[in-house]
């Protein structure tokens, strides 16, 4: 059990026997009445989103989740294959669980996989990742106004808007939570 005031982003809670990942938490302390937390949670089984208000003094059930450090191997149909780096066991994660994170997966990279009741329920992607620009349009300097961007495609198929000076073959840092370009990376 966890107190409502102790709930943080990334916590996995149980709601009616289903695991939910806390994606946002806003603490509210009204002038009158008890403090509470407004929590936005993602259902880890079907991806639906639930908004819930929890008083800070109330307790909610937290899910007992194991975290396994795994290396991404390959995609086989609608399954993504990972290898546990400690036990060397294969872990198959369904495409529904991966969702829109597919383009952040790179063969050989390590990710944390959350396991609940012997079932993978989430793959944690690092907040920032470096990608190589595979496809990029070339623009002539002075062609547009300042602050202009263009779409590029990375080696994983991820599409990101970047400044016009980014060229094919360069490395860029991407914020995976917002899918936004952060900076060019010098190798």
Swiss-Prot record:
Pfam families: EFP, EFP_N, Elong-fact-P_C. Its main location: cytoplasm. Gene3D superfamilies: 2.30.30.30, Nucleic acid-binding proteins. CDD domains: S1_EF-P_repeat_1, S1_EF-P_repeat_2. GO terms for cellular component: cytoplasm. It is found in: Cytoplasm. GO terms for molecular function: translation elongation factor activity. One of its GO terms (biological process) is peptide biosynthetic process. Keywords: Cytoplasm, Elongation factor, Protein biosynthesis. InterPro entries: Elong-fact-P_C (IPR015365), NA-bd_OB-fold (IPR012340), Rib_uL2_dom2 (IPR014722), Transl_elong_fac_P/YeiP (IPR020599), Transl_elong_KOW-like (IPR013185), Transl_elong_P/YeiP_cen (IPR001059), Transl_elongation_fac_P (IPR011768), Translation_prot_SH3-like_sf (IPR008991). It comes from the Bacteria. Pathway: Protein biosynthesis; polypeptide chain elongation. Involved in peptide bond synthesis. Stimulates efficient translation and peptide-bond synthesis on native or reconstituted 70S ribosomes in vitro. Probably functions indirectly by altering the affinity of the ribosome for aminoacyl-tRNA, thus increasing their reactivity as acceptors for peptidyl transferase. Belongs to the elongation factor P family. This is Elongation factor P. It comes from Treponema denticola (strain ATCC 35405 / DSM 14222 / CIP 103919 / JCM 8153 / KCTC 15104).
